[in-house]
Amino acid sequence: SNETITRKGDVQMKKWIVILFAMLPSLAMAAGANVPLDKANNDLSDKASLQNGAKLFMNYCFACHSTQYQRYERVANDLEIPVDLMKENLIFDPEAKIGDLMENAIPEESAAKWFGAPPPDLTLVARVRGTDWLYTYLRSFYADPSRPFGVNNIVFPSVGMPHVLEELQGIPQPVFETKMVDGEEHKVVVGTKTDGTGELHTEEYDRAVRDLVNFLEYSGDPVKLEG
């Protein structure tokens, strides 16, 4: 179904995989390795999920993160999105053509100034981190006034990006427990509690994140859809 596509090329994976691993150091070296990961349970055969994931990516992630080893046309064909619908709702750059690579327009210098480093390309992020990590990470932001963007993340402590899905989830509050660390008591964030300000209920938000992760897994290896 194309009902999930609303509102505002060919990938040479083997050639670029080493380069992209080098471009993702912040993700590959993220802390929080001992945090239990929730199962994403995404389904690459679910076209409606993939379409919604593409919509979420373009609306909430693409302003900063590209998937520059994909082409709009390949995505439209693979996800069964009509080309006119793709152009109207998912290609925001008026100069971009359907056959172009999915590169965003944010200048690298500006991105480095705003975030401390250029936001990484996400074509292969699901390969680098895994779908369970992504699914848990996107559901683990919490309010932290001490951080530059007002949020932190259980899976990725001291994360250097805002909670881009805040509109959907709201800003969860941290849940603390006191634990002994090296013989001293420390307050540790062990979970989050949603504040009810997001557009989606918890189950709806989890489903949206699953769709986004589904799209990112597809992005990392489009040939999986042929299996």
Model-derived regions, located:
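Post-cleavage N-terminal segment of exported redox proteins
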Residues: T4, D10-L44, L216-V223
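Electrostatic cytochrome c docking/interface patches
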Residues: A31-K55, S66-N77, G220-E226
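Processing junctions and N-termini across compartments
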Residues: L24, K55-M58
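The canonical Cys-X-X-Cys-His
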Residues: F57-Q68, L212
